[in-house]
Curated annotation (Swiss-Prot):
Protein name: ATP-dependent Clp protease ATP-binding subunit ClpX
PROSITE patterns: CLPX_ZB
PANTHER family: ATP-DEPENDENT CLP PROTEASE ATP-BINDING SUBUNIT CLPX-LIKE, MITOCHONDRIAL, ATP-DEPENDENT CLP PROTEASE ATP-BINDING SUBUNIT CLPX-LIKE, MITOCHONDRIAL-RELATED
Annotated GO MF terms: ATP binding; ATP hydrolysis activity; ATP-dependent protein folding chaperone; protein dimerization activity; unfolded protein binding; zinc ion binding
Keyword Transmembrane helix tagged: no
GO cellular component terms, semicolon-separated: HslUV protease complex
Lineage: Bacteria, Pseudomonadati, Pseudomonadota, Betaproteobacteria, Neisseriales
Domain ClpX-type ZB: 1-49
Annotated source species: Neisseria meningitidis serogroup B (strain ATCC BAA-335 / MC58)
Source organism, top-level taxon: Bacteria
InterPro entries to which the protein is assigned, alphabetical: AAA+_ATPase, ATP-dep_Clp_protease_ClpX, ATPase_AAA_core, Clp_ATPase_C, Clp_protease_ATP-bd_su_ClpX, ClpX_bact, P-loop_NTPase, Znf_CppX_C4
Gene assigned in the entry: clpX
Amino acid sequence: MSNENRTCSFCGKSKSHVKHLIEGENAFICDECVSNCIEILHEDGNDGTPSESAGGEPEESGKLPTPAEIVANLNDHVIGQEQAKKALAVSVYNHYKRLRHPKAGANVELSKSNILLIGPTGSGKTLLAQSLARKLDVPFVMADATTLTEAGYVGEDVEQIITKLLGKCDFDVEKAQRGIVYIDEIDKISRKSDNPSITRDVSGEGVQQALLKLIEGTVASVPPQGGRKHPNQEFINVDTTNILFICGGAFAGLEKVIRQRTEKGGIGFGASVHSKDENADITKLFGIVEPEDLIKFGLIPELIGRLPVIATLEELDEDALINILTEPKNALVKQYQALFGMENVELEFEEGALRSIARQAMERKTGARGLRSIVERCLLDTMYRLPDLKGLKKVVVGKAVIEEGREPELVFES
């Protein structure tokens, strides 16, 4: 169609009768029709901009759960760790409250409440972070700090974390910029001493510096659809300022650093006395950790400064592990009972068996993470034969199954 013959698809006026004729895909609209559309929208009370609440802030869908509601939800998935849950709930609530009311703190700059979780392997650090993201319905991604390298080195550079986060929300930049990133094993990239390194450190201090930029807020350039970077390519820009970062680690050996700070040492009446329960000692020491201890451990001061909320998790004892096996909504015992139920077979774990499973996990020092492998091992042969065992009504797992490797008791219909 020639320029002279083009007409507005709405009013039919030709280009010569209007000031502007805007071209779209197989359609045109003139400036007069655009003005009419704007007037109609204003009359309906909708000018196309986000609606504002009484406080003048853009409203967001859904009610922000209170700290108490967040903790109640975490209790459904994670056993114990009450102090850590409370610290997480308050920090996360304040973070998203700040995002929902950007003008409320116009006179005061509200900083981000990134979180550092310190606790032994299998104590629930990862599960807490996952459960938080699920409750808040925000994009969530996990990264292993030990796999990260500085940009320019072989390996996964820190910006790929943002690529993964974008992938979790179908490359919706707005959603990604309000997501949660959990970085595990942060303690494994500590530098060897608290003195700055004069050499290149591909997987330690250098990675901390790269993470620092991401955590404190930067615009990360991400390849579209998660491809690899190459010249002459358009990038997606993601502002990490409002992404909540949760870092976690076991920090094995940190207790020694804290002891050096808190105890004078020596012999005689001034000597320090340690409890026979080493786990209780470590839990108490982690509870009084200071930023200077983390610096001595090997984290750079700038990174610690960007992780203002420090929450410590306790070593799980035998009773806590038994509760983990049976109490949460997705408890391991409930999962296996559901699997057996699909074959119309009841699965029962005796109290002695549960205690033995918990004890073995403690001996292996794997915490809750090691429970599944123990249960899987004791039920493997039974699950292999299960579809072919006609008339089977019930499977009973006793103490001897766990401790002596015996077969579970099989109860058939009479």
